Each structure stands twice: as C-alpha cells, then as structure tokens.
C-alpha cells in the first residue's frame, strides 16, 4: 500500500474542494509523488493544481483533470478492471490508474517519454502496467477489448478504433476538438453508444500516424 505525503494530502484536499468525490481517486493522488514526473526546474510546482511542460511539446495534466477523468472511468457500472491509456506522457496519469485498476495498458508515440515513464513505474513498484510505443489513434487491439479507455490528448474527432475496443458497458473518456475542446464520456451499450459532454478542457493535440 502506498503512503501519502503531506503535500499530496494537501493537493487531494484541494481537489475535493474542487468537486472530486471518489475517495479512492483522492487517495491515489495523495500517494503519488508528482514531483517525480517533472523536470528538476519545475519540481517546486509539483503540487500546484496546474498543467506543466515536460518537454517534447507535451505537458503533465492539471491534477484536477487527471482526477476528474479517472473518477469518470470508475463511475462505470461494470466495475472496470482493465484500462487503456492513450498518451502515457510523463506517466503521472498512468501511476494514478495503476493504483485503481488491475491492469493498465498505455500507448505513447514519443519513445523518450515512454522510456522515462517506464522507469518511473519501476521506481514506484507499479508492475501492473504494460506500455507500447505506437500511434494512439489505433489503440491496442491485441490487448482489448477494454473496460475503460482514457485519452490524454485532444482528438479532432472520436477515433473509431478506440470505440471498437470498448467492452459492453465500458467507458471512453476523451477530449475532443481543436481550438475549442470538450471532454466527452462515451459508454458502450451493446452495439450502441451513449455520449455525454462533461466540461470544457484544454489539451495538447492527439497526433495521428507519426511515432518518434
């Protein structure tokens, strides 16, 4: 069991005030050392509720949106166990998921970020995470279908490949849009889908095709 820090607990308390209610999510935030996922020059900002640059034109997401998206995944009626993450990035969201799901599968298009994230998972003794260097628009079909899918970059439209990889009752949480972005919650119901718009968000774009 992971141990919380005073700064982590303060951040979790702030997120609770911002509307995050799932106790498991708040505990995961409190127990995850966010400074581990940041460049040295930005570690003093680790417990601020803000997105920060991590290099390669990418960011570590605002803790509130990490918690909100995770909470939405866990609110699914099917008690999700296996989750696909599109956009490993720093690995911070990955580490939160690894404390709440039995299995985490994460796809990252930038090899150097994936390498660093994998090292951080080992540092934190989080061994239920599998990583792939690839195009997030394609998902990870050989490991699916998934109970939950979370996308940490904004797609111009919902990728069909990701929707296809959802289990019945599974949820896809994804930011959609270019200049104006909305967080979408899509639930698979048999062969159909229910879609709900949650709130306005701001993410880096989900790039298709190129992996580097």
From Swiss-Prot:
Its EC number is 2.1.1.77. InterPro entries: PCMT (IPR000682), SAM-dependent_MTases_sf (IPR029063). Keywords: Cytoplasm, Methyltransferase, S-adenosyl-L-methionine, Transferase. It is found in: Cytoplasm. GO terms for biological process: methylation; protein modification process; protein repair. One of its GO terms (molecular function) is protein-L-isoaspartate (D-aspartate) O-methyltransferase activity. It catalyses: [protein]-L-isoaspartate + S-adenosyl-L-methionine = [protein]-L-isoaspartate alpha-methyl ester + S-adenosyl-L-homocysteine. Belongs to the methyltransferase superfamily. L-isoaspartyl/D-aspartyl protein methyltransferase family. PANTHER family: PROTEIN-L-ISOASPARTATE O-METHYLTRANSFERASE (PTHR11579), PROTEIN-L-ISOASPARTATE(D-ASPARTATE) O-METHYLTRANSFERASE (PTHR11579:SF0). This is Protein-L-isoaspartate O-methyltransferase. It comes from Pseudoalteromonas atlantica (strain T6c / ATCC BAA-1087). The lineage of its organism: Bacteria, Pseudomonadati, Pseudomonadota, Gammaproteobacteria, Alteromonadales.
